[in-house]
Amino acid sequence: MGANNQGKVFEANIEKSAADQKLFFYRIKDVNPMFLKRGAAVSKNKYDCFLFFKGYLFPFELKSTKSKSISFSEKIIKPQQIKYLREATQYPNIIPGFLFQFREPENKVYFVHINDFLTYKNIAEKQLKHTYKNKVNKASIPIAICEEIGTEVRSMKKKVNYTYYLNKLCGELIKKEQSRDKPLHTYNTPVKTGV
């Protein structure tokens, strides 16, 4: 199956997981430019999807790869995706970020808050001094950095597809958001959850 199709499978698994866990979820449909008149402008979605959990809105941009890193290339992570996720941080009770799926060697998914992503991207591209434990790639975000700065999305493989425990993820992210006032807090700080 092609990479694009695997990305759609990932989106469908996230959507089904949300429905199974009774989470309000909305997936924004992409416009297929092939169905438009020649020269028609294609609207650009702000996010792939969002979900609502316990008074918080989570705008997500989903990325899937079989590689060990996800490129910063504008073909992969589009400027408007970064722009709108960053803009969403201005509002209370909104936790925006990426869901990065690394399909191989074993399916791993990480939520990376847009602020943590932008900090890493700036350091990586400018080759600045940093405190990351793992190797910094100038042109991509590797799985090791996602493990370090992100929050793992727990999952269970069924016969073919995955169920992602989005309720647990959102509970963890809300606790991290609520503790943001504390000094030196980032989204990769471990927290105890009772979700």
UniProtKB/Swiss-Prot annotation:
Task: Tell me the domain of life.
Answer: Bacteria
Gene Ontology molecular function, alphabetical:
nucleic acid binding
Q: Which SUPFAM superfamilies does the record match to this protein?
A: Restriction endonuclease-like (SSF52980)
- Protein name, entry field: SPbeta prophage-derived uncharacterized protein YotM
Q: What organism does the UniProt record list as the source?
A: Bacillus subtilis (strain 168)
